[in-house]
Regions:
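Detector for outer-membrane/organellar transmembrane beta-barrel domains
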Residues: 212, 222-341, 407
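Solvent-exposed loop segments that connect transmembrane elements
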Residues: 181-206, 244-246, 278-301, 375-395
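Sequence/structural signature of outer-membrane beta-barrel proteins
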Residues: 60-66, 98-102, 131-133, 138, ...
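Outer membrane beta-barrel
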Residues: 39-186, 220-224, 311, 366-368, ...
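Transmembrane beta-strands of outer-membrane beta-barrel proteins
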Residues: 51-57, 93, 122-124, 170-172, ...
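Outer-membrane beta-barrel "beta-signal"
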Residues: 312-314, 393-409
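N-terminal periplasmic/intermembrane-space "pro-region" immediately following the signal or transit peptide
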Residues: 5-8, 14-58, 409
Length: 409
């Protein structure tokens, strides 16, 4: 009976069936590159102060191959993003503000910082939480499993210290609270009362957990040789998991290892993540899953409380000096897998093959993605994909074509 109640609740929510996703930002351009209109850049005469205002305007084409979707070959507005960066002597700031589809807004990062020297600084506000591959856990436009579990482009309100030289990269963070759900760019564990505008009451209304007092640590070492460079790193995160119903604190922790290998035109990135949530739920609420959500751009969803995630991404750069404005094409394969602890909850998998075209200020991604037991793929048909795989489309592979075109300034 529970299976059919869950399915009914998810079908009700299918109107929002993951039609949108945040999508990654553009790669950083060298400071010497003059950015196009309407980019604003100002430097003081003494070089002690600066202001840069840039951003992007993007549209998205999506063709999804499952019954409940409305995106059967549709061009839609994706985002208008503003990036504001400023410096004054040792002080600096960085804010990314997104105007997204369906009238949503989000902040992917927003902080002020103080630079102690060329190697170390501290950031206060909403910096990225240091963990694993940074900032994006894949090459393609289509986010993969680590992102949906909260391990990619994830900011929190707090403080971060960073030290980086040619060999070492050390980051330490403390985040008393997560970003408010209404402006989250990336998903995070949340209470139903904060996510109820885009959640399913049948299955999620008693979910009342949120993370508090999270600490993060990430350390990476870079090794270089003749024509190659490799980064190897490890990450840890831990937090209280406060339940507003019981007023008790559960626990959360995660650990990960990652590697980035560059050799010629090839880049290979990989990571393994182990996470565990131990909630203090009231009687009658299962501890096997917790609720996650963002700003409502996609529906809130349950994830397995304990799981292991693995991913590997392979990219190859093709430089095109004879093709005019088109300077580079990156082709890539992204693969990720989520292995849940609970018996009978089958693995979730995602696989993307695609290409990124850099003809700045125009940039485009073309992604072909297959996914199994992954909520964004299949919508209500696959709505329990991150947990018990009891939806109509569980253990079926779903396919999506996505083309994103943006003007970056």
């Amino acid at each position: 009976m529970n299976k059919y109640v869950i399915s009914l609740g998810l079908i009700i929510s299918s109107a929002a069936s993951f039609a949108s996703e945040p999508g990654p930002a553009a790669p950083d351009q060298p400071p010497a590159v003059k950015k196009p209109f309407p980019h604003i850049a100002w430097r003081s005469d003494d070089g002690q102060s600066s202001l840069d205002i840039g951003g992007a305007l993007r549209v998205n084409y999506r063709d999804e191959h499952w019954d409940t979707t409305e995106n059967n070959g549709r061009f839609l507005f994706d985002t208008f993003r503003l990036d504001v960066q400023a410096t004054h002597k040792q002080l600096f700031s960085d804010v990314g503000y997104w105007f997204q589809d369906d009238g949503k807004r989000s902040i992917d990062r927003g902080y002020v910082g103080y630079r102690f020297n060329t190697n170390s600084n501290v950031q206060l506000g909403a910096p990225f939480k240091p963990f694993g591959l940074e900032p994006y856990p894949q090459f393609g436009w289509s986010y993969h499993i680590p992102f949906f579990m909260g391990y990619g482009v994830s900011a929190g309100t707090g403080l971060k210290y960073s030290y980086k030289d040619k060999d070492w990269d050390l980051q330490l963070g403390y985040f008393p609270r997560m970003l408010p759900s209404g402006i989250r760019y990336s998903p995070e564990v949340g209470r139903y009362s904060d996510l109820d505008d885009n959640a399913v009451a049948f299955t999620q209304s008693r979910q009342d957990n949120e993370k508090r007092n999270q600490v993060n640590a990430r350390v990476a070492r870079t090794f270089t040789g003749d024509g190659w460079k490799t980064e190897i790193g490890a990450s840890l995160a831990a937090a209280e998991l406060y339940n507003a119903t019981t007023r008790d604190d559960g626990d959360y922790w995660a650990g990960g290892v990652h590697a980035i290998v560059n050799a010629g035109n090839w880049t290979v990135t990989s990571q393994a993540i182990r996470y565990e949530y131990d909630p203090e739920n009231p009687d009658g609420v299962s501890n096997d899953s917790v609720l996650m959500g963002g700003n409502g751009l996609t529906p809130a969803y349950l994830i397995a409380s304990k799981a292991t995630i693995g991913s590997i991404n392979v990219g190859y750069d093709i430089f095109t000096p004879s093709l005019g404005q088109l300077k580079k094409i990156k082709v890539y394969n992204d693969y990720s897998r989520m292995m849940k602890d609970k018996s009978g909850w089958d693995d979730s998998q995602m696989f993307t093959v695609g290409a990124q075209f850099l003809a700045m200020p125009i940039m485009a991604w073309v992604d072909f993605t297959w996914a199994k037991n992954a909520n964004p793929f299949g919508g209500a048909e696959n709505g329990t994909g991150w947990t018990n795989t009891n939806s109509v489309g569980s253990n079926d592979w779903y396919y999506r074509t996505n083309i994103n075109i943006g003007y970056y300034f």
